[in-house]
Amino acid sequence: MKKRALISVFDKDGVLELAKFLRDRDVEIISSGGTYKYLKENNIEVKEISEITDFPEMLDGRVKTLHPLVHAGILAIRDNKEHMKTLEEREINTIDYVVVNLYPFFEKVRENLSFEEKVEFIDIGGPTMLRAAAKNFKDVVVLSDKKDYEKVMNEIKENNCVSFKLRKTLAGKVFNLMSAYDAAISNFLLEGEEEYPEYLSVSYKKIQDLRYGENPHQGAAYYSSTEFDGAMNSFEILNGKALSYNNIKDLDIAWKVACEFEETACCALKHNTPCGVAVGENSKEVYLKAYDADPVSIFGGIVAINRKIDKATAEEMVKIFLEVVAAPDFDEDALEVLRTKKNLRVIKCKNTPQAKNYMVTVDGGILVQGEDNKLANEYKVVTEKEPTEMELRDMIFGMKVVKYVKSNAIVVVKDGVATGIGGGQVNRIWATKEALERGKGGAVLASDAFFPFRDCVDEAAKNGIKAIIQPGGSIRDEESIEACNEHGISMVFTGVRHFKH
């Protein structure tokens, strides 16, 4: 029985080689639209789909392959006598290969196009053919990914057929692709309408397999959103080997912290926790301030700066061991210096962080919430003493940092530098003591949540703190306010909590 292949692709890379390979084995090629013209122009013997259906393309190409004569040829089960009898009676030929890739909705949905223009890139005929062929994978070889062309050709060369195992894998890839494609379309259409829809559909594509996860015994891979360009799916590695699982997690937070600030800022980070954060006039200044805040923890850490890095900054950075250095750009002479460290990963971050929903898995489910991107409802002075202008700037700085520290979290600040960071403690007084121990000489203290007792204020006063900022909201707020008044400390309530678990 003569074999037939239906080829209809938007991305034509590799399709000529595949079509020629099939024709050389006497497989009849059927195609439509641009693919038909492309194959014809390249001297591939091809039959137009309208010759099969006796029905022309219509509605500006929206209806080409949506026809019973096409889908019956794909869906008929070859060892089902009734199916084959029906095909024979209606003079329908079987289709044995379906080679289809889709309109580039993933790419177009992120471009600056109108709503109507984006809708036109929603593919209908392609998914319909792919799903039909994938369902009948026992009898039909379905190719939705150009990376699989060679695998199929190799099996045919070696065995004169395509194995059941590969057919099944290719079918699975179709439904994997379709779930992502449909998710992207669904999220596009529901954007702004339904924040938390009945069914959660997410669309991510694998960028790479990772050597391992948090630990060597854990497998891992990195996936990129198909729906928007965030900071972590558009960076460029300028030096060093590929990023690890831990590198990517740490880089994400370090870059978010640095981008919290309009002024030049640096975040040094270790194990997903900031260990030194500073703002200043230039990249060298902020790096040195962040380094001085905790010269021990920064070793082997991640450093992100929200400005171009120059040679002077690079020369300071290579004095110690760092895993990753990230910035929006680098001077050429700075790159030369950084590249003297062969294993230092130098990352050019092209995008600022995008405020999207945050997801975390639990056993049997996923929790979804909005990003913590609200700093304060107000800055309400609740004490007799008011903060100075510099103290208020440090307060706001502290709140920008503390929301990235695991709760309970306290940050001590002095002149635009986080001099002490205490986090991940099960009670607030321990976090306060940790931050004050590391941040001796700090003037302002920021807390991610309210003080349940006055003990944190008393501890702050013993260590020279002059101003405190916190959300407020405790039933014992008055005790903390009274303690501040006793110690001559100003305190500001923001009304916004920043728990991080």
Swiss-Prot record:
Pfam families in UniProt: AICARFT_IMPCHas (PF01808), MGS (PF02142)
Catalytic activity from the UniProt record: (6R)-10-formyltetrahydrofolate + 5-amino-1-(5-phospho-beta-D-ribosyl)imidazole-4-carboxamide = 5-formamido-1-(5-phospho-D-ribosyl)imidazole-4-carboxamide + (6S)-5,6,7,8-tetrahydrofolate; IMP + H2O = 5-formamido-1-(5-phospho-D-ribosyl)imidazole-4-carboxamide
Key words, A-Z: Hydrolase, Multifunctional enzyme, Purine biosynthesis, Transferase
GO BP, one annotated term: 'de novo' IMP biosynthetic process
PROSITE patterns: MGS
Cellular-component GO terms for this entry: cytosol
The MGS-like domain, residue ranges: 1-144
Pathway per the UniProt entry: Purine metabolism; IMP biosynthesis via de novo pathway; 5-formamido-1-(5-phospho-D-ribosyl)imidazole-4-carboxamide from 5-amino-1-(5-phospho-D-ribosyl)imidazole-4-carboxamide (10-formyl THF route): step 1/1; Purine metabolism; IMP biosynthesis via de novo pathway; IMP from 5-formamido-1-(5-phospho-D-ribosyl)imidazole-4-carboxamide: step 1/1
Cited InterPro entries: AICAR_Tfase_dup_dom_sf, Cytidine_deaminase-like, MGS-like_dom, MGS-like_dom_sf, PurH-like
EC number: 2.1.2.3, 3.5.4.10
UniProt comment concerning the protein's domains: The IMP cyclohydrolase activity resides in the N-terminal region.
Homology family: Belongs to the PurH family.
Name the record gives this protein: Bifunctional purine biosynthesis protein PurH
Taxonomic classification: Bacteria, Bacillati, Bacillota, Clostridia, Eubacteriales
